[in-house]
From Swiss-Prot:
Xref: Gene3D superfamilies: Insulin-like
UniProt propeptide residues: 50-70
Gene: BBXA4
UniProt cross-references to InterPro entries, sorted A to Z: Bombyxin (IPR017097), Bombyxin_A (IPR030680), Insulin-like (IPR016179), Insulin-like_sf (IPR036438), Insulin_CS (IPR022353), Insulin_family (IPR022352)
CDD domains hit by this protein: IlGF_insulin_bombyxin_like
PROSITE patterns recorded: INSULIN
Positions of disulphide bridges: 29-79, 41-92, 78-83
Chain positions found as Pyrrolidone carboxylic acid: 20
GO molecular function, one term: hormone activity
GO cellular component: extracellular space
Protein name from the UniProt record: Bombyxin A-4
Signal peptide annotation: 1-19
Top-level taxonomic group: Eukaryota
Subunit and interaction comment: Heterodimer of a B chain and an A chain linked by two disulfide bonds.
Amino acid sequence: MKILLAIALMLSTVMWVSTQQPQGVHTYCGRHLARTLADLCWEAGVDKRSGAQFASYGSAWLMPYSEGRGKRGIVDECCLRPCSVDVLLSYC
């Protein structure tokens, strides 16, 4: 029952976010940015790997390049300027 409620809440949040985006972009700041990103990443099934997992494959030198976009730039891209859901997903 709790899982169904969580899924329904997440889907309604995603639907609300998509309807609030004029021309596919929206400004996300603070707690709203964190929650939206968490919901989108959870829905997409993204599983971030830690540095220890990269080291276990013997490719620790690849870690800085393989993690995708850093978290520092998300505020610049999505809070100071409007961004799309695709940009948010690139931070998962």
